[in-house]
């Protein structure tokens, strides 16, 4: 039982990860490193990028992707890859933590179906802005936002990185509960040394 284990095994999922560097990719990378350094074990599932070799202290499962960089700035993953789902399931995570409400959360839900473990979703940014930038036509934009909110609503717990992010999520039609879980920093507390 995950609640009685001293250390958890966590599956982190996101639609961006190095070589793509953005705020969410950095957050996922930091989560994985910190968990792996002593809080438990972690596996990261992300879309494949041509020519990328991963060398981290934790396993990275890359799944098939297609180039959508001109549209959204990164590659879109195919979340139904049997090989990737098998590899992530074999890790036997106690919890799945998705950081993107699109393909990563679809994959998280497929994995939850197999493993019967909870999915936590973190809403990092205002995805409606990205949708409106990538998709023309109000009806298509509204449909995409509704699908995004439905995907988020299917998660067992929803975190937002700020009260403003939570308000944005509500404005999109999300009616469920959420917890404000601010992104952490790894600087020591207290006065900054003069060095």
What is the predicted function of each stretch?
Residues 1-62:
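N-terminal subdomain of nucleotide-sugar transferases
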Residues 100, 125, 162-163:
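Helix N-cap/beta->alpha junction signal
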Residues 69-98, 103-110, 114, 142, ...:
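An amphipathic, basic-hydrophobic alpha-helix
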Residues 10, 95, 112-130, 159:
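Active-site proximal beta-strand in glycosyltransferases
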Residues 48, 164, 184:
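Carbohydrate-associated surface elements
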Residues 153-162, 179:
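A short beta-strand/loop micro-motif in the catalytic core of glycosyltransferases
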Residues 118-120, 128-150, 187, 192:
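Nucleotide-sugar donor phosphate/pyrophosphate-binding loop at the beta->alpha transition
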């Amino acid at each position: 039982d995950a609640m009685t284990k001293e250390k958890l095994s966590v599956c982190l999922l996101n639609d961006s990860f190095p070589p793509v560097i953005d705020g969410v990719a950095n957050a996922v990378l930091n989560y994985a490193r910190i968990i792996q350094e002593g809080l438990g074990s972690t596996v990261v599932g992300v879309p494949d990028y041509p020519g990328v070799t991963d060398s981290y202290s934790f396993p990275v499962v890359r799944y098939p992707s297609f180039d959508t960089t001109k549209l959204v700035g990164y590659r879109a993953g195919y979340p139904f890859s049997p090989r990737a789902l098998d590899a992530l399931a074999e890790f036997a995570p106690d919890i799945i933590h998705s950081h993107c409400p699109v393909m990563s959360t679809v994959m998280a839900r497929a994995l939850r179906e197999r493993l019967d473990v909870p999915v936590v979703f973190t809403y990092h940014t205002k995805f409606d802005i990205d949708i409106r930038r990538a998709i023309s036509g109000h009806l298509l934009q509204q449909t995409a936002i509704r699908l995004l909110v439905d995907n988020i609503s299917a998660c067992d717990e929803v975190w937002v990185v700020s009260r403003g992010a939570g308000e944005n999520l509500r404005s999109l039609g999300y009616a469920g509960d959420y917890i404000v879980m601010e992104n952490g920093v790894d600087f020591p507390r207290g006065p900054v040394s003069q060095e």
